[in-house]
Structures are given as structure tokens and as C-alpha cells.
């Protein structure tokens, strides 16, 4: 085993990377409230795992979506547990994200030179809210349907570009299969990819600049 490790160490300098990760200076003022961002990340990873598991059973069609969710909850092995964890982890992610934003704002973590870290955090907050909007509609029950209809109808109040925006969101003039397909694609592919990219940027900047000092 040591020979295998030495082979990789010679080429990749694994020990140097490990030392850099584990030896980062942590300011003495850091407390449990500085863990809120990490908890948000953990919730996101739980969302990815449980969401991926549900894609094996969920059917993104207006005629089968609700029945497939019922199947997950009543027939699939541990489906009720996976969906419940997904749901509660989603709520926890939103709550931890809000508390994290408040902590950063109240401790001045958005000030120079960490403006870009704050910007990426704001983008992540918008993406988190978008997860909630798109995921809420996927069961395609009465609550999900009318939520989509209301949310996608909001841009209609914007002059000139309002109607085209509504049609872009819905995929057609009215809420239907095209809308569900778009929301499913956003929820399972586009938003997770964007979130992963911005999280990586966010953490790299934190890694480079370190944790902000006390006020």
C-alpha cells in the first residue's frame, strides 16, 4: 500500500495538498454561526442524492407526475423516507441560507476585498429560491399547478416584454406539459449545475481570502 501511495505522491504531491487543506488558519473569533454556510452545502448534497434517487421513479408528464409521486410515497422501497428527507432538507437549506446571509451581513463579511464572494453568495441565494419554485410544481397536484400558474404569470405585468417572458417560462400560451418539462429540466439539471459552479467559485474565494475578521 505504501508503494502505491508513494507512486501517487511522487506525481501529485498529495501530502502537500493535504497539508494546505488542514493547516489553514482559523481566526479565534470564529464560532458556530460561521458553520451556517457549510450546513447549507451539506443540505445541497443531501438534495442531490435524494433527488437523484427519485428520478428513477418520477415521470415528468402531466398525466403521470402525481401518480409517480404517490408510487414513491407508498410503493417504492424507502421512497417515503427519501422524499421526506428531500423535502425537509430543502426547507433546512433555505433556512440555513437565510441565516448565513444575515450572519455575513451583520459581521461585515461583504466588505472589501470580499465583494465578489458576496456577489456569488447572492447568486446562490437566487438559485436556492429557484429550486423551491421549480421543485414545488413537480408533483403536479392542485397546489403545484396553481403555484406555477401564479409564478409564471407575474412577468405579464411588465410592459412590452411581459407576455413573451410568460410564454418563455411556460413553453406555450398556457400552463401544461411544456411548463412541467421546463421546470423539471431546470430543477434537475440547469439549477444544480449552476449551483455547483457558483459554490465552487464561492469556496475558492473564501479559501483564497480567508474568513473575515471581527467588526
From Swiss-Prot:
What are the GO cellular component annotations? Answer: chloroplast thylakoid membrane
Cofactor(s) listed in the protein's UniProt record: heme b; heme c
Q: What's any GO biological process attached to this entry?
A: photosynthesis
- Any idea which positions bind heme b 2? 86, 187
- Which InterPro entries would you find in this protein's record? Cyt_b/b6_N, Cyt_B6_PetB, Cytb/b6-like_sf, Cytochrome_b_N_euk/bac, Di-haem_cyt_TM
Q: Does the keyword rRNA processing apply?
A: no
Q: Where does heme c bind?
A: 35
One Gene Ontology MF term: metal ion binding
Q: Which residues bind heme b 1?
A: 100, 202
Q: Does the keyword Metal-binding apply?
A: yes
Q: How is the cofactor bound?
A: Binds 2 heme b groups non-covalently with two histidine residues as axial ligands.
What SUPFAM superfamilies would the database entry show?
Transmembrane di-heme cytochromes
| Family the entry assigns | Belongs to the cytochrome b family. PetB subfamily.
The entry's other comment says: Heme 1 (or BH or b566) is high-potential and absorbs at about 566 nm, and heme 2 (or BL or b562) is low-potential and absorbs at about 562 nm.
Entries under NCBIfam families matching the protein = PRK03735.1
Q: How does it assemble?
A: The 4 large subunits of the cytochrome b6-f complex are cytochrome b6, subunit IV (17 kDa polypeptide, PetD), cytochrome f and the Rieske protein, while the 4 small subunits are PetG, PetL, PetM and PetN. The complex functions as a dimer.
Quote the function comment for this protein. Component of the cytochrome b6-f complex, which mediates electron transfer between photosystem II (PSII) and photosystem I (PSI), cyclic electron flow around PSI, and state transitions.
Q: What's the name of the protein? A: Cytochrome b6
Organism of provenance: Nicotiana tabacum (Common tobacco)
